[in-house]
């Protein structure tokens, strides 16, 4: 049973290719994990040794990402908001995903438990 997880929240309103989408999710997962390793080393270590559970869900738009980020940070969860470089499909600086955690599953679920899987 997993006790820790990371959730990556993608914007539903962006029309990204599968490849672009996968890269943005990966950027979020790695960036938030590195942040957690520095800020919450005990959470990172437990998550890493449990198998690094990750879940990808969807949010309606940018405003919802900002709201989720604020909620997560209020609970002390590490977050990473990913902005695209804009070299291929979307304008530079477009926020694509929000990664939350890794953190205790019950805390992460307070922020993301209502979101639908992608």
UniProtKB/Swiss-Prot annotation:
It comes from the Archaea. Its EC number is 3.1.1.29. It is found in: Cytoplasm. One of its GO terms (molecular function) is peptidyl-tRNA hydrolase activity. Keywords: Cytoplasm, Hydrolase. One of its GO terms (cellular component) is cytosol. The keyword Cytoplasm applies. It catalyses: an N-acyl-L-alpha-aminoacyl-tRNA + H2O = an N-acyl-L-amino acid + a tRNA + H(+). InterPro entries: Pep_tRNA_hydro_II_dom_sf, Pept_tRNA_hydro_arch, PTH2. It holds the Pfam family PTH2. The natural substrate for this enzyme may be peptidyl-tRNAs which drop off the ribosome during protein synthesis. Belongs to the PTH2 family. This is Peptidyl-tRNA hydrolase. The lineage of its organism: Archaea, Methanobacteriati, Methanobacteriota, Thermococci, Thermococcales. The gene is pth.
